Every structure is written in structure tokens, then in C-alpha cells.
């Protein structure tokens, strides 16, 4: 008896989506002359001045299927008949072009299946047509379907003479597998007890519903029964659950208000499913039982549903300039790979930090001068009424470049400062994120705090040099000060003057900023979880408002400690001393000086920095087997034709227009409808899966 293996479509790689360019088509139609050129390249028959393709020309040479020498002739003819509407064994150019157009229609998957069954090419399916194709499938060879039963008679009539049109055929094809499953149950229960054994249950599901099974479900079909016999209601509920998994996912999203990470109980999903008459409590019981068999947990989240029935999706992402896969799987993450990942993040963070600092540096200069302005006046010192007045006077007295006084040392320090902050935050978040990708709020706050503490090593020397350069222009007759002269004057220990105040500012800032950014970013993602660059910019700016404003008192104290006090100005010995003296001499409002400037500087700076950092990770993508920024790609449920378009292979440049989706669509006929055709001819032993998959 011949051994069959599945029709070889599972090897097709997933490549970028072929977007719709002609409404309502998903694929742009090929030009007639270009299509004719491709047709003539493969057409091997010439009759009466016309060229034709044979079945082998079309299926084996053009589509690249059944490349083995011992291919199944009947399967090749069946597939060629889809395009051969005249059913004369030859494909003309007009038929070749017509099928290309069919592949561009929104319901191409069903129409392709219909033409597979329309053996006479008259636009209808007869009983003989249906029976002929069904009898050639692998499923029928393993679990025969009764072609004389009541199901067939309901569709084709008692005498089996009724013809089925396209619209009716789509329903027939949908109902066929459900009926086949019930008939298989009856065949395994000849005594009519209403029960079958666990092994028979496994055999039926693997054969009749294998196009709906994931490896995790397939491996647990026996264990989910707990060794008990399977009743007919349980069997029907199980098959219904597989069919309704997309509906189950919608129920879950309704129960969690759109969150894909919330863990929910059986009672919660039962409550949410009350409005869905298609879902029964028994199906929910099986769902949780199956999820427990797969990963041994009492509650489920969206990833558990995807493990049972993965979504067909396309990835919507920014164009990648480079893509590197450092490891094959997360299990291969060595210490060296993790160091490389941190180095990669540090490099991108440095560039992002420099970009962000340059954009907002004029605002930072205004903020610093406002914070350093003491109560009362000082001879020769420019007085500012507000931030806008400060901005105008800097431009008037020092020129436009005066707004960038001290930028160079700022860039030299801000690059590693922002890099270490972003890297440490990502590193700690990675360590505190569970296997499902969830991280508690306390862990987000801790990661941000660690990031803030780590940056002080770079921030304090940078800040003290920057501040002294920024305030140097306030004295009209003052000599020009260089960054290096400030460094030599302060020395190593002097560069860390005010470090306590710096910690007092940076730790709470980052502890507030990063969790706020992550949650705001998630809220601004679209329904598919994707963040447009503008939403990243907005999330970064919004998160900067509370973070920057709430730590302004610490920033004022740090500025006063690090600036050089002029003659007649109060000097401070430490954080507590500065706090007491500022309060006594200037009142509590002095602690909030420059708040507006700080918010207007920090919010856009971090917005620009974060959007640059995440976009760089999208553009220069490296998979280290760890976590990627959320929102960088969307897992969007697609239609069968979109799935086909997303799986287009570019190996054959002759697959143009609708033919770009030909092979994936034929795979869809197999995977969606379970119409697996034998690949090898009779008497040929099947090879292993790895060797059986051809090009």
C-alpha cells in the first residue's frame, strides 16, 4: 500500500507583505506583454500557431512543485486543472492570464479550491467532481468518507444529480470537514456507545483536524483526556474549540479590555463569553485543560491561546537597513552574547543621546541660567525676568551660537551618559521580565532607579563643566572660559562636587520616567500593538513632564553646588546646607526656579532620544535572543490572501503579478481546507520530512 506524505508547502519562507496596489485586489496585475513573455518561456507545446503549457510545464517547471522524479502524476494534473479551464490537458495564454487575475481577487483561496473541484470547467461542481477529488486526498485514504451518506445527499440530492455553484460550494467545503469528523467518530464507535478510546480520538484529530493543530496540542491529545474514554459531546466540543479559537481570542481581549498580557481565570472568560452563543462552558473547560497540559498553569493569557492556535500574521515594521541573527534561540544566549547585546545598546544609546541633547541644548542653557539667578541683583550680571527673556538676551548679547555655549563637552558626556542609562534600564528590565514578557511595576521603577544611579558616573563631571561654561556668558566683561581649564581647576574629586544632589535628582527622575514611558507607549500603540515613530516621540515627551518637574528642587540644589559663587553670593557646603540657605534667603519658590525650562528641555530631549534609540534598533536589527522594544512590530491577523501575499517567495523572478501568491495560495487550500494531495507516485516510499521537501 502506498505511503503518502503532505503536499510540500510548509517550507515556504515568510517575506515582506505584498501590499495592495489595485482595489480591490491585494496584488497588482501583471502587464499582458510581460506575462506573455513568461508564458512563452515555459510553454513547450505549439499547435496551430498557438503556444500551450502542459501540466508539468505549469506545476513542476513554472510553479516549482513536485520536483522529484517520482512525482505523483495525478496530483500534478489536479493542480494544473485549476488553471486549465477548458480541461483539455493544455493551458493556453488566455487561461494562464485568467488564473493570474483570479489570484488577485479577495476570495482567491476559495475560488482556487472551487476550480480544483470544477473538473469540467462549466462553473459548477457535480457529485462526480467532488467525489473524484476527495477520493484522491490523503485524508480519505486514511479515514474514508461515506460518499453515499445523508450529508452528500443533502447537498447533491438523493440521486446525486444536483450541481453546486460557487457560493454553495464554499459552504459545502466548510461543512465537509465537520461532517468528516463526526463520521470518523461513528466509524471508531461501531457499537454506538457514544465513546471512543483516547488513541482513536488522537487518530481522528490528527488526521481530520491536523491543519488546525500546533505541535503542543498534537503532543497532548492523549494526555488531555487523562486516559478516560472520550464522549461524543467532548469530541464535538473539542473540534468546535479548534474551529472557534479566533473567537475565543476576541473573548479574551474583551475580558482584558484589549490587554494581551493579563492572566485571567476560567470564571472571567466564562463571564465574558456569555454573549457568544457559539462558545459553551465545556469548550472553556477543554481550553483551560489544554492550556494546563501545555504549560502547567492555572490561568491563561493571550500567548496561551496563540500556542493552541497561532495567528497568521504579517509584521508591520520600519524598513530594516540591516538584519543579523546572533543566536538561533534564546537558549543559545551565552554570557558573551549578552555582553554583545549591551554593547550594541550602548552604541545606539550614545548616538541617540547625542541627537537628543543637540536638539534641546538651547533650552537647557536657558534653564541653567534661570536656576543660577539669585534673588537680588549683582553688578555686571544680566538679569532675566523669565525664560523667554533669558533666551532673547542670550541671542542679543552673545549671538545665536551663544545658545550652544558648552555643547561640545555636553556631547562628549551625554553620549555615554544616555547610553549607560538606556543600557542599564534595558538590562535590569530584561532580568526582571518573566517568560511571558511581563514585568511588574515595581520592577520597572527599580530598573529606572538603577539606570539613574549608573549615569551619575558620567553625569556629574559633565554637568559641572557644562554649568560653568553656560553661566560664564552672564558677565559682560568676563574672559572666555574653556572646558579643559575648568577640568584642570576642579581636578578629579572636584568634578564630582554635588554628586549627592545629582543622585537625588537622577535616581527618582529615571524611576519615574521609564515606567511612565513604557505605559504611555503601550497606551498609544495601535490595535495591533504597533507604535508609529510619532507615538514614540509623544510618549517620550509626555513621560518627561512629571519626571522633570517633580525633581526640579534637587536640580536647583545641584546647580547651586556646582556653579562658582561670585563675590557677595551665598556659598554652600552640601545638600542640606544649600537646602536650608535657599529656603531661608529666597523662600520655597526658589526650589522651583526653571521648572518650565527644565520640562521644556527634558521632555523633548528624552522624546527625541527614545524615538531615535528605538528606531535605530528597528533599522539596525540584531536578534540576540533577548527582548526587543515592544511596539516595534505588530502581529496583525490577516485574511488568507494576505497570508499568501505575506509568504511570497522571490526565488523565481517569473512569478509576477498574481502569480507571486500562487504557491502560497495553493498551500492555503491545503492548510485551511485539509485537502492534502499525495506527492509521490504509487509504490514510492516517502522520504523523511527534511529530504522530502523540495525546491
Curated annotation (Swiss-Prot):
<dbReference type="InterPro" id="IPR018108">
    <property type="entry name" value="Mitochondrial_sb/sol_carrier"/>
</dbReference>
<feature type="binding site">
    <location>
        <position position="193"/>
    </location>
    <ligand>
        <name>Ca(2+) 3</name>
    </ligand>
</feature>
<dbReference type="GO" id="GO:0005743">
    <property type="term" value="C:mitochondrial inner membrane"/>
</dbReference>
<feature type="binding site">
    <location>
        <position position="118"/>
    </location>
    <ligand>
        <name>Ca(2+) 2</name>
    </ligand>
</feature>
<feature type="topological domain" description="Mitochondrial intermembrane">
    <location>
        <begin position="614"/>
        <end position="695"/>
    </location>
</feature>
<dbReference type="GO" id="GO:0015812">
    <property type="term" value="P:gamma-aminobutyric acid transport"/>
</dbReference>
<feature type="binding site">
    <location>
        <position position="124"/>
    </location>
    <ligand>
        <name>Ca(2+) 2</name>
    </ligand>
</feature>
<feature type="transmembrane region" description="Helical; Name=2">
    <location>
        <begin position="406"/>
        <end position="425"/>
    </location>
</feature>
<dbReference type="GO" id="GO:0015183">
    <property type="term" value="F:L-aspartate transmembrane transporter activity"/>
</dbReference>
<dbReference type="InterPro" id="IPR051028">
    <property type="entry name" value="Mito_Solute_Carrier"/>
</dbReference>
<feature type="binding site">
    <location>
        <position position="86"/>
    </location>
    <ligand>
        <name>Ca(2+) 1</name>
    </ligand>
</feature>
<keyword id="KW-0496">Mitochondrion</keyword>
<dbReference type="InterPro" id="IPR011992">
    <property type="entry name" value="EF-hand-dom_pair"/>
</dbReference>
<feature type="topological domain" description="Mitochondrial matrix">
    <location>
        <begin position="463"/>
        <end position="497"/>
    </location>
</feature>
<feature type="transmembrane region" description="Helical; Name=1">
    <location>
        <begin position="346"/>
        <end position="363"/>
    </location>
</feature>
<feature type="transmembrane region" description="Helical; Name=3">
    <location>
        <begin position="449"/>
        <end position="462"/>
    </location>
</feature>
<feature type="region of interest" description="N-terminal domain">
    <location>
        <begin position="1"/>
        <end position="310"/>
    </location>
</feature>
<keyword id="KW-0812">Transmembrane</keyword>
<feature type="transmembrane region" description="Helical; Name=4">
    <location>
        <begin position="498"/>
        <end position="517"/>
    </location>
</feature>
<feature type="region of interest" description="Linker loop domain">
    <location>
        <begin position="311"/>
        <end position="327"/>
    </location>
</feature>
<dbReference type="GO" id="GO:0015813">
    <property type="term" value="P:L-glutamate transmembrane transport"/>
</dbReference>
<dbReference type="GO" id="GO:0005313">
    <property type="term" value="F:L-glutamate transmembrane transporter activity"/>
</dbReference>
<dbReference type="InterPro" id="IPR002067">
    <property type="entry name" value="Mit_carrier"/>
</dbReference>
<keyword id="KW-1133">Transmembrane helix</keyword>
<feature type="topological domain" description="Mitochondrial intermembrane">
    <location>
        <begin position="426"/>
        <end position="448"/>
    </location>
</feature>
<feature type="domain" description="EF-hand 4">
    <location>
        <begin position="176"/>
        <end position="211"/>
    </location>
</feature>
<dbReference type="InterPro" id="IPR023395">
    <property type="entry name" value="Mt_carrier_dom_sf"/>
</dbReference>
<feature type="binding site">
    <location>
        <position position="189"/>
    </location>
    <ligand>
        <name>Ca(2+) 3</name>
    </ligand>
</feature>
<dbReference type="GO" id="GO:0000514">
    <property type="term" value="F:3-sulfino-L-alanine: proton, glutamate antiporter activity"/>
</dbReference>
<feature type="transmembrane region" description="Helical; Name=5">
    <location>
        <begin position="537"/>
        <end position="554"/>
    </location>
</feature>
<dbReference type="InterPro" id="IPR002048">
    <property type="entry name" value="EF_hand_dom"/>
</dbReference>
<feature type="domain" description="EF-hand 2">
    <location>
        <begin position="105"/>
        <end position="140"/>
    </location>
</feature>
<dbReference type="GO" id="GO:0015495">
    <property type="term" value="F:gamma-aminobutyric acid:proton symporter activity"/>
</dbReference>
<dbReference type="GO" id="GO:0043490">
    <property type="term" value="P:malate-aspartate shuttle"/>
</dbReference>
<feature type="region of interest" description="C-terminal domain">
    <location>
        <begin position="628"/>
        <end position="695"/>
    </location>
</feature>
<feature type="binding site">
    <location>
        <position position="90"/>
    </location>
    <ligand>
        <name>Ca(2+) 1</name>
    </ligand>
</feature>
<dbReference type="Pfam" id="PF13202">
    <property type="entry name" value="EF-hand_5"/>
</dbReference>
<comment type="similarity">
    <text>Belongs to the mitochondrial carrier (TC 2.A.29) family.</text>
</comment>
<keyword id="KW-0999">Mitochondrion inner membrane</keyword>
<feature type="transmembrane region" description="Helical; Name=6">
    <location>
        <begin position="594"/>
        <end position="613"/>
    </location>
</feature>
<dbReference type="Pfam" id="PF00153">
    <property type="entry name" value="Mito_carr"/>
</dbReference>
<keyword id="KW-0677">Repeat</keyword>
Amino acid at each position: 500500500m502506498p505511503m503518502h506524505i503532505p503536499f510540500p508547502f510548509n517550507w515556504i519562507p515568510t517575506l515582506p507583505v505584498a501590499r495592495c496596489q489595485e482595489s480591490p485586489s491585494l496584488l497588482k496585475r501583471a502587464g499582458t506583454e510581460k506575462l506573455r513573455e513568461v508564458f512563452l518561456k515555459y510553454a513547450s507545446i505549439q499547435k496551430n500557431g498557438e503556444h500551450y503549457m502542459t501540466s508539468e510545464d505549469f506545476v513542476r517547471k513554472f510553479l516549482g512543485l513536485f520536483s522529484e522524479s517520482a512525482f505523483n502524476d495525478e496530483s500534478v494534473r489536479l493542480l494544473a486543472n485549476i488553471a486549465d479551464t477548458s480541461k483539455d490537458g493544455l493551458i493556453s495564454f488566455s487561461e494562464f492570464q485568467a488564473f493570474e487575475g483570479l489570484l488577485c481577487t479577495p476570495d482567491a483561496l476559495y475560488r482556487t479550491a472551487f476550480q480544483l473541484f470544477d473538473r469540467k470547467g462549466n462553473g459548477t461542481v457535480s457529485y462526480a467532481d467532488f467525489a473524484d477529488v476527495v477520493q484522491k486526498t490523503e485524508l480519505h485514504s486514511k479515514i474514508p468518507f461515506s460518499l453515499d451518506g445523508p450529508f452528500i445527499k443533502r447537498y447533491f440530492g438523493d440521486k446525486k444529480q444536483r450541481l453546486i455553484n460557487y457560493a454553495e460550494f464554499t459552504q459545502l467545503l466548510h461543512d465537509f470537514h465537520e461532517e468528516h469528523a463526526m463520521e470518523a467518530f461513528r466509524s471508531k464507535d461501531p457499537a454506538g456507545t457514544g465513546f471512543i478510546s483516547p488513541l482513536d480520538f488522537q487518530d481522528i484529530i490528527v488526521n481530520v483536524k491536523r491543519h488546525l493543530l500546533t505541535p503542543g496540542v498534537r503532543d497532548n491529545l492523549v494526555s488531555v483526556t487523562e486516559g478516560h474514554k472520550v464522549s461524543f459531546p467532548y469530541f464535538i466540543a473539542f473540534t468546535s474549540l479548534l474551529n472557534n479559537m479566533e473567537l475565543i481570542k476576541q473573548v479574551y481581549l474583551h475580558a482584558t479590555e484589549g490587554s494581551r498580557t493579563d492572566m485571567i481565570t476560567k470564571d472571567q472568560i466564562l463571564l465574558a463569553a456569555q454573549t457568544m452563543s457559539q462558545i459553551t462552558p465545556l469548550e472553556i473547560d477543554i481550553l483551560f485543560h489544554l492550556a494546563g497540559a501545555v504549560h502547567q498553569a492555572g490561568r491563561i493569557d493571550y500567548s496561551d491561546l496563540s500556542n493552541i492556535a497561532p495567528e497568521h500574521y504579517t509584521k508591520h515594521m520600519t524598513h530594516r537597513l540591516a538584519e543579523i541573527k546572533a543566536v538561533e534561540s534564546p537558549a543559545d544566549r551565552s554570557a558573551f552574547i549578552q555582553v554583545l547585546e549591551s554593547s550594541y545598546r550602548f552604541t545606539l544609546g550614545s548616538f541617540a543621546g547625542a541627537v537628543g541633547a543637540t536638539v534641546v541644548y538651547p533650552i537647557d542653557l536657558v534653564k541653567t541660567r534661570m536656576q543660577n539667578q539669585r534673588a537680588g541683583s549683582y553688578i555686571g550680571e544680566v538679569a532675566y525676568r523669565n525664560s523667554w527673556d533669558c533666551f532673547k538676551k542670550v541671542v542679543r548679547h552673545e549671538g545665536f551660537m551663544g545658545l550652544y555655549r558648552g555643547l561640545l563637552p555636553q556631547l562628549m558626556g551625554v553620549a555615554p551618559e544616555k547610553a549607560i542609562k538606556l543600557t542599564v534600564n534595558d538590562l535590569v528590565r530584561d532580568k526582571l521580565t518573566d517568560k511571558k514578557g511581563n514585568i511588574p511595576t515595581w520592577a520597572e521603577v527599580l530598573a529606572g532607579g538603577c539606570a539613574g544611579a549608573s549615569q551619575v558616573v558620567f553625569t556629574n563631571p559633565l554637568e559641572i563643566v557644562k554649568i560653568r561654561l553656560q553661566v560664564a556668558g552672564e558677565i559682560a566683561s568676563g574672559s572666555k572660559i574653556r572646558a579643559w581649564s575648568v577640568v584642570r581647576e576642579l581636578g578629579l574629586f572636584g568634578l564630582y562636587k554635588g554628586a549627592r544632589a545629582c543622585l537625588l535628582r537622577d535616581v527618582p527622575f529615571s524611576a519615574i520616567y521609564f515606567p511612565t514611558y513604557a505605559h504611555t507607549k503601550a497606551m498609544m500603540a495601535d490595535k495591533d500593538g504597533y507604535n508609529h515613530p510619532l507615538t514614540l516621540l509623544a510618549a517620550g515627551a509626555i513621560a518627561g513632564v512629571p519626571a522633570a518637574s517633580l525633581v526640579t528642587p534637587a536640580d536647583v540644589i545641584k546647580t547651586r553646588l556646582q556653579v562658582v559663587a561670585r563675590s557677595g553670593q551665598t556659598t554652600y557646603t552640601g545638600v542640606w546646607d544649600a537646602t536650608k540657605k535657599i529656603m531661608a534667603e529666597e523662600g520655597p519658590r526658589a526650589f522651583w526656579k526653571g521648572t518650565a525650562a527644565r520640562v521644556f528641555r527634558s521632555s523633548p530631549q528624552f522624546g527625541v532620544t527614545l524615538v531615535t534609540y528605538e528606531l535605530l534598533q528597528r533599522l539596525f536589527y540584531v536578534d540576540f535572543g533577548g527582548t526587543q522594544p515592544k511596539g516595534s512590530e505588530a502581529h496583525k491577523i490577516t485574511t488568507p490572501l494576505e497570508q499568501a501575499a505575506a509568504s511570497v517567495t522571490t526565488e523565481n523572478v517569473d512569478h509576477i503579478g498574481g502569480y507571486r501568491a500562487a504557491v502560497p495560495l495553493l498551500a492555503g487550500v491545503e492548510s485551511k481546507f485539509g485537502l492534502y494531495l499525495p506527492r509521490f507516485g504509487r509504490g514510492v516510499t516517502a522520504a523523511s520530512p527534511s529530504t522530502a521537501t523540495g525546491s
